[in-house]
Amino acid sequence: MRSKLILLLFVVAVFLNSSFSQEQTSKELFNGINLDGWIVYGTEKWYVSDGELICESGADKQYGYLGTEEYYKNFVLNLEFKQEDNGNSGVFFRSTIDGTKISGWQVEVAPPNNHTGGIYESYGRGWLIKPNPNKDKYLKMGEWNKLTVKVYNDKVTTWLNGHEMITIEDQIIGKGEGRIALQIHDGGGIKAKWRNLTLTDLN
């Protein structure tokens, strides 16, 4: 009986420690008030309204990025996005930015039939993996969508509204270092909203 009690206490202690550790390493990337903790790249519009982070095409109609000040290696990123107008955007990870040139990997966020949830390598190999076309039905254009991105060593998995979109293991990704960044595509006429950006550090 005593041994069972000790075992039970051990299991409870491990669970509480795990929960505490996860709480300690999770944080909000967007404070809902301003762009503190982020860097704007390019001339496209990034602003906060009603607690939402909004990107919108500017007069130059070029690529634009909003990158974290910090680098993140292994993590789970949860966020919500809502596409208005064209809504062509993306979420970059382990990326570096020079002006409006970004090197790294993008989780696609795009209108229907454009591979949302897939992985694209910028200024490199291009598309590494696209979701099965049947999964495009999980995207709710014009509504709030939940995107989850897990990056751990050389493995990346994405989920859209609770549905796994892709999983890929890639040695080059595994060696990557850099920021998380949100993208607005070039061409003009684009608007997207973001909220509830939460990151759990897995290092």
Language model segments and positions:
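Carbohydrate-interacting regions of secretory-pathway proteins
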Residues: F20-N203
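Bacterial Sec-dependent N-terminal signal peptides
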Residues: M1-Q24
